[in-house]
């Protein structure tokens, strides 16, 4: 058992560093997307850089381009928050005596709630950008599934924390 926990701690220590770097890259991507969007709105000219960044050619009209930009900002923000939060969970696991803590459970609930709310936002934005219904529903169900799985993992982590506390009090 000791070898398993020490291996987990070591992997989580390195993974948390990778997650921190990835989270920063995603956060910078959010800032770049917002900046390109603001510049495009101020100048009234949607730049080719923004269009290639969000994956559109510019023929769709302002409403769709704004919605596509918002969709990209949302997706990058979700990714950034997820990666940073999972990095915090891994950092906690690398430092604590048990991976099962209330704080880690709360972090997993946070991710679950973000994905739950985002599933509806992405569905709405998908229809605004005139994505095919099957694509929008697939994205909706995918993010909803992630939300449910993360919530179940949070409940398991919380239950593990309770069992760990009872075990510690028994000894």
Name each model-derived stretch:
Residues 96-129:
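Hydrophobic alpha-helical transmembrane segments of integral membrane proteins
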Residues 50-79:
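Membrane-helix boundary elements
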Residues 42-60, 125-141:
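Membrane-interfacial helix-loop-helix connectors in multipass membrane proteins
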Residues 118-171:
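Alpha-helical transmembrane segments of multi-pass integral membrane proteins
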Residues 16-26, 70-78, 109-112, 141, ...:
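Alpha-helical transmembrane segments of integral membrane proteins
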Residues 1-39:
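Cytosolic juxtamembrane helix and N-cap/initiation of the first transmembrane helix
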Residues 7-11, 85-109:
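Cytoplasmic juxtamembrane regions at transmembrane-helix boundaries
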Residues 23, 27-30, 75-85, 112-123:
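Hydrophobic alpha-helical transmembrane segments of multi-pass integral membrane proteins
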